[in-house]
């Protein structure tokens, strides 16, 4: 299928994954100057936090783009035509349906946990039947995140595989890849738990793989972790009215 995709278009499977959330693109938008593509939600959140720069290459993004990014309709159409392999069960799924598949893929849930990077806190029940995440629990996680933030401004974590502590996200990633790469033990991800949408009952089967897939960047660079999703997007909408189109 990958060969068919390459032969028919100039795209590869990697082009269908958002560089911010590292998931299959949802409502893809494209920057005008550097032509990088992101999920619309990821892009708007990044613009809210990082200002005038592309989240990937730090290229300039116009004021109009920051409020109303251009849909990558060509890419959306390609995603409706071609399939790719689920990263866990290897089932062939149309790219535009991949996120929906993750919600019902038990292997994906076991491997990576909750499939949405910035979930809706009002969802009453997740895809595997876990209890809903309330705004109160999100507030508790924000307090935990702040308490774990060191003098450098970056939160620190304990390795759940050896209990060594005081790791920043990057140091934890390096530590686990160096010392626990082939250690597959069900644990709870300390980074996920510290985030406003984190679920302390969510167990990750392969922690090191989860780190490499989910935590290659600091969420705080793209998301204001003291605001819930609804507040962030309401702010983005309000700011869009101030843009001179």
UniProtKB/Swiss-Prot annotation:
A zinc finger (C2HC RNF-type) spans 86-105. One of its GO terms (molecular function) is ubiquitin protein ligase activity. InterPro entries: Di19_Zn-bd, E3_ubiq-protein_ligase_RNF138, ZF_C2HC_RNF, Znf_RING, Znf_RING/FYVE/PHD. GO terms for cellular component: site of double-strand break. A zinc finger (C2H2-type) spans 157-180, 187-215. A zinc finger (RING-type) spans 18-58. The keyword Transferase applies. Zn(2+) binds at residues 86, 89, 101, 105. It comes from the Eukaryota. Pathway: Protein modification; protein ubiquitination. Residues 128-153 are annotated as: Disordered. Residues 225-243 form the UIM domain. Keywords: Acetylation, Chromosome, DNA damage, DNA repair, DNA-binding, Metal-binding, Repeat, Transferase, Ubl conjugation, Ubl conjugation pathway, Wnt signaling pathway, Zinc, Zinc-finger. The zinc finger domains (C2H2-type and C2HC-type zinc fingers) bind DNA and mediate recruitment to double-strand break sites. They show strong preference for DNA with 5'- or 3'-single-stranded overhangs, while they do not bind blunt-ended double-stranded DNA or poly(ADP-ribose) (PAR) polymers. E3 ubiquitin-protein ligase involved in DNA damage response by promoting DNA resection and homologous recombination. Recruited to sites of double-strand breaks following DNA damage and specifically promotes double-strand break repair via homologous recombination. Two different, non-exclusive, mechanisms have been proposed. This is E3 ubiquitin-protein ligase RNF138. It comes from Bos taurus (Bovine).
């Amino acid at each position: 299928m990958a060969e068919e995709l390459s032969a028919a278009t100039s795209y590869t499977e990697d082009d269908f994954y958002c560089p911010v959330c590292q998931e299959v693109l949802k409502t893809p938008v494209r920057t005008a100057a550097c032509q990088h593509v992101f999920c619309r939600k990821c892009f708007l959140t990044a613009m809210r936090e990082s200002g005038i720069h592309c989240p990937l290459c730090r290229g300039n993004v116009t004021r109009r783009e920051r409020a109303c990014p251009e849909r990558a309709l060509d890419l959306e159409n390609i995603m409706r035509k071609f399939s790719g392999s689920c990263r866990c069960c290897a089932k062939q799924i149309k790219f535009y349906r991949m996120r929906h598949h993750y919600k019902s893929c038990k292997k994906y849930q076991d491997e990576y946990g909750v499939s949405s990077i910035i979930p809706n806190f009002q969802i009453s029940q997740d895809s595997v039947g876990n209890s809903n995440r309330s705004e109160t629990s999100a507030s508790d996680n924000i307090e935990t995140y702040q308490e774990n933030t060191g003098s450098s401004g970056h939160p620190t974590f304990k390795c759940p595989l050896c209990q060594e502590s005081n790791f920043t996200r990057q140091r934890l990633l390096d530590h686990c890849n160096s010392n626990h790469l082939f250690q597959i033990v069900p644990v709870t991800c300390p980074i996920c738990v510290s985030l406003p949408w984190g679920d302390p009952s969510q167990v990750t089967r392969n922690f090191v793989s989860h780190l490499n897939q989910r935590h290659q960047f600091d969420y705080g660079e793209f998301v204001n972790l003291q605001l819930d999703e609804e507040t962030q997007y309401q702010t983005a909408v309000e700011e869009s009215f101030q843009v001179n189109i």
